[in-house]
UniProtKB/Swiss-Prot annotation:
Biological processes per GO annotation: cell division; chromosome condensation; chromosome segregation; DNA replication
Protein name: Chromosome partition protein MukF
Residues annotated as signal peptide: none
Membership in a protein family: Belongs to the MukF family.
Compartments, as annotated in UniProt: Cytoplasm, Nucleoid
Subunit-structure text: Interacts, and probably forms a ternary complex, with MukE and MukB via its C-terminal region. The complex formation is stimulated by calcium or magnesium. It is required for an interaction between MukE and MukB.
GO molecular function, a single term: calcium ion binding
Species classification: Bacteria, Pseudomonadati, Pseudomonadota, Gammaproteobacteria, Enterobacterales
Pfam families according to UniProt: KicB, MukF_C, MukF_M
Keyword entries, A-Z: Calcium, Cell cycle, Cell division, Chromosome partition, Cytoplasm, DNA condensation
Gene Ontology CC: cytoplasm; nucleoid
Task performed by this protein: Involved in chromosome condensation, segregation and cell cycle progression. May participate in facilitating chromosome segregation by condensation DNA from both sides of a centrally located replisome during cell division. Not required for mini-F plasmid partitioning. Probably acts via its interaction with MukB and MukE. Overexpression results in anucleate cells. It has a calcium binding activity.
Amino acid sequence: MSDFSQTVPELVAWARKNDFALTLPTERLAFLLAIATLNGERLDGEMSEGDLVDVFRHVSKTFEQTHETVAQRANNAINDLVKQRLLNRFTSELAEGNAIYRLTPLGISISDYYIRQREFSTLRLSMQLSIVAQELRAAGDAAEEGGDEFHWQRNVFAPLKYSVAEIFDSIDLTQRLMDEQQQGVKRDIAGLLTQDWRAAISSCELLLSETSGTLRELQDTLEAAGDKLQANLLRIQDATLGQEALGFVDKLVFDLQAKLDRIISWGQQAIDLWIGYDRHVHKFIRTAIDMDKNRVFAQRLRQSVQGYLEAPWALTYANAERLLDMRDEELMLLNAEVTGELPPDLEFEEYSELRERLAALIEQELQVYRQEQRPLDLGRVLREYLARYPRQRHFDMARILVDQAVRLGVAEADFNGLQAQWQAINEYGAKVQAHVIDKY
């Protein structure tokens, strides 16, 4: 930032002595911005009291204020801006009552902050850096030539102090304004996601990409010119080595190097932080989509069915043919010819027949839960069933039991999108994840 020749106590005493104060409510600030806009259209930069009253009348109309007292309130607003040193009033004895008003540097700075400085332009930044490069190159050449104190003051110190430093401060101000702009974009994105995240996805993507592009353009422009600027500053610094009389130049060069480092490092840091925020927003959207799919799908389906007559819709689904695993070739290889008769215990049984009998038995046992409307804890029932059979049969038994249990009913927790806990069902590490079936 700019250097101050006064100390803190001196500045505090000066502000107290001159009774400095700033109070700008929204109405006053809008009035000041309107005056600045009107001032930009005037070649002489002067405004009469009638012009200011007309501007205030427009502001009052925008804020939906009464029209009866507009003249009195306009006079109070003008006097308030003059008192706060935002406007200068010039009166003449020859033309009494026809005062001329001009914006003060403070008024121009405040209005410029809200109107023009917020307009980021890569071309403007490139021109500023080009001017800085020319000034530093000329100052470096003058420093290497050497000369008396007047030469150093005029050809080295003055360009660095009143041109390069001010442009660095302007770039720094632009970066700080972009910080506020990013915060505003974040508030806009938060508002969009709060209202309706499905409709806001495209708008959020646009805001994220625009801000990312602006930050990248700014950083690319700074990095392209940063090395050359540092090289010229080092040339000037080398020329002042060993010369105590040029300490003021060396101190200024050191401050400029610190400003340039801060400007370039800010650009990369801002990009890194924005990338993190971009990922956070996308993660939030993905999480919202997943939660909506699991939690609100049933509710939206019911609403769609209920409102079908008002808003007809069509359901498209895939009905592909099932793929059957045919093992005839393997069975033919195992079909060895045998002689004699087998005992009944060794007679071959088709797996499908065995499975049907087991399924019928399990279905009969599970019907008790449905008849008595008792909750069916699938994990507990699986543990009890699997304890009756050897380990080799656990997988087949668990599959049959789960199929039969699912046919009986559903779990209320499934509609709420809640994730079930894993439960152990045997002593060999097998687990199942299922809610208690409570609706048949």
